[in-house]
Amino acid sequence: EVKKSPPKIAAKSAVKTTPSASMTQTFPWLKTYPKEIKWDTKIPETPLYDIFEKSAAQFPDRHLIDFLGKKYTYADVSTLIDRAAKGLQSIGVQKDTRVALFLPNCPGFIVFYYAAMKIGATIVNFSPLYAAREVATQIEDSNAEVMVTLDLEALYPKIYKMLERTELKKIIVCPLKEQLPFPKNILFPLFKSKEIAKIHTQDERVLMFKDLINNDGKAKPVKISPREDVALIQYTGGTTGLPKGARLTHASVTANAHQADMGFLKEDDSQERV
């Protein structure tokens, strides 16, 4: 067995620049910037998925996710994203279709977040703590057509009812046990059976994750305009009334990612832990 040495990763360069006096008079907040941040950095405008795709190409064998002990490499997740993207297209998802995520932090969230954006669809995040009334209100407000959720009693029954109460058209179910490592994937159904929902597999509006991704992963390319196309709709906390959907373009979200990378992430590329 030949063990390959991991690729050498160049440390992030931090060029210290100091804004001129005239600049700080016009933009006084520049004085508060950390010295390591290049205040005049040009932020690239790209589709959000491009950031992931570049990382997957550069670090295919590095671990991207560690979910309760089950590890996924960038290559693993990239394959799932590609297949999920084509699967979404096969059920009618296209550019600007609203794809809702009613999920906790889990691998399925990452897969569908990027799969939907890759084909130009718009993600709508739903808190898994929402009551049925809140779910229905947000589905109607966002015009969500497809919902992704887990096969848990706390989540799935709420969403299945929405097929009759709202304009929701499809549900994609990601079984939790399929995302767990051995032996948790065996023990969970045995000891937590009451927490697992009965899925309406005979209903054509309900699709299982493994069936959706049973394809070659070659989705039809979709042209995305970073400044114009909405990547996701993120709802506010609703402290002053009902939550309001904030429409975030690909350009705005990628800008935020690059800014966070410059200002907060001090590790070398691919070494960060979140």
Describe each model-derived feature in a short phrase.
Residues 197-235, 242, 266-274:
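Conserved pre-ATP/AMP-binding loop-to-beta segment of ANL
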